[in-house]
A protein has these predicted regions:
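Hydrophobic beta-strand residues in large extracellular and virion-surface proteins
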Residues: 30, 39-41, 56-58, 67, ...
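Short connector loops at helix/strand junctions that flank enzyme active sites
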Residues: 51-53, 62-66, 102-105
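Short, acidic/polar N-cap/turn motifs at the starts of alpha helices
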Residues: 53-55, 86, 105-107, 148-150, ...
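Acidic-basic catalytic patches of nuclease active cores, encompassing PD-(D/E)XK
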Residues: 2-47, 73
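Beta-rich nucleic-acid/ligand-interaction surfaces
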Residues: 47-57
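Non-catalytic C-terminal interaction segments of nucleic acid-processing enzymes
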Residues: 2, 113-185
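Conserved catalytic cores of phosphodiester-cleaving nucleases, focusing on short active-site segments
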Residues: 34, 56-58, 63-75
């Protein structure tokens, strides 16, 4: 991963420690990619991050956009590593409030092995609301493809689903930034 530390690691939720580390690393890697492309990259304020789901603000000339960065996710079997074919979408967060699908960011950027997929937030939300059956609640994350699952057994109020990344990539406002995988340039 990159060496940029523009985004500082969030301290708090011990139950998400590893995911927070991965998330911060993904945010910093995307920040590096933005800088490499000539953008001015600024981290969001703590308030923007917590309440608006905005991680980074990118500016280049008169073009400015905000991003909520999602680190690579493991699939339904964590022992098999990362799954770039499917991703998680969050309708409600662990507190039961609007999840990051209802972000105020312009884009949700999904990290994959070799790139970042930028999905227009409204377009992604509209698609998810039409293809995910939020009335079909399943008992296991393994069964949450286009259905919803939550961790109420842990006292959490989240509502999440899994969708295929190919559907995100197919959205007409989606764009992709390849990662600079060769750091020896």
């Amino acid at each position: 991963m990159g060496t940029n530390t523009l985004v500082k690691e969030f301290v708090g939720r011990k139950d998400h420690k590893d995911y927070i580390k991965r998330g911060t690393a993904a945010e910093n890697l995307l920040a590096e990619e933005g800088l490499r492309r000539g953008y001015i990259v600024k981290p969001s304020s703590e308030k923007q991050n917590m309440y608006d789901h905005i991680d980074l603000i990118l500016t280049k000339g008169d073009k400015k956009f905000t991003v909520d960065v999602k680190a690579r996710r493991t699939g339904t079997d964590k022992s098999k590593g990362f799954d770039d074919l499917w991703t998680v979408v969050e309708f409600k967060n662990t507190m039961g409030d609007s999840g990051w699908l209802y972000s105020k960011s312009d884009y949700i950027a999904f990290e994959r092995k070799e790139d970042f997929v930028f999905a227009d937030t409204k377009q992604l939300r509209d698609m998810c609301e039409s293809i995910v059956d939020v009335t079909k609640r399943v008992a296991s994350f393994r069964n949450a493809n286009y259905k919803v699952w939550g961790r109420s057994y842990q006292g959490k109020k989240d509502l999440i689903s899994r969708i295929e990344m190919s559907k995100v990539v197919a959205l007409d406002k989606t764009f992709i930034w390849l990662k600079n995988l060769d750091k020896n340039e």
